[in-house]
Amino acid sequence: MIQKYFLFILTIILSISFAQQRKMELEDTIKNEIDLKYLFFLPKDYYSDKNTGWPLILFLHGMGERGADLELVKIHGIPKIVKEQIDFPFIAVSPQCPIEYVWRDDDMQQALENLLQKIVENYRVDKTRIYVTGLSMGGYGTWSLAARRPDLFAAAVPICGGGDLATVIILKNLPIWVFHGGLDGVVLPEESEKMVRALERAGGKVRYTLYPKAYHDSWTETYDSPALYDWLLSNRKAED
């Protein structure tokens, strides 16, 4: 996709809080004039340790958090975690999908790529440890973006989403940890399971956690677990 123009407007909002969270809202106009705002978190030692490259995690929210109010993005997932954990060891980027789009749309996928490119260019990101995760609509977006750019990510964590079976051959070398609730009636567990089975048949690096008694919210337990972040950090992609 050829980018016709790129208007980059960056507003930095610094706040002092218990979690030492630094937040930035970005209004980023690209092809088709998508305004993409996001929450941005830097680890507490980012400025004091000037020689470290930091892992980055991209979080994609669900359908109900679309719109133009960034407060909605803070309700679930990574934005909620960074408010609670002082020592969260990732740069965290949590964009908000405009109401008229979903994450799987081609224009949104391009907007996410452009957003990550800007972050990598302007911050000390360890390019061997860039991860993508999302829930529900964001779970679908995680599958799609990982398939679009498997060269960019070191691992992916789609939660209660689903993917395109045609992309399995592209994804088979990417470490993927899939989560779903066994009683999910919004996005059926089969949406995750068909991708897991196909990746297993292809020899993929996939693992699957099914919460037998969970409904659609299979993300709270997932993002609350230190094991998730340990697993992410254990995965690096080869140097370019």
Model-predicted regions and their roles:
Residues 17-56, 133-135, 140, 145, ...:
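A domain-start/cap signature at the N-terminus of enzymes
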Residues 44-52, 100-137:
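Gly/Ser-rich "nucleophile elbow"/oxyanion-hole loop immediately N-terminal to the catalytic nucleophile
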Residues 1-22:
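Bacterial Sec-dependent N-terminal signal peptides
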Residues 72-83, 160-169, 190, 194:
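Alpha-helical scaffolding within the catalytic cores
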Residues 117-122, 128-172:
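Primarily recognizes the serine-hydrolase "nucleophile elbow" in alpha/beta-hydrolase
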Residues 88, 171-176:
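Short, proline-enriched alpha-helix->beta-strand connector loops that line the catalytic pocket
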Residues 159, 175-240:
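C-terminal catalytic histidine-bearing segment of alpha/beta-hydrolase fold enzymes
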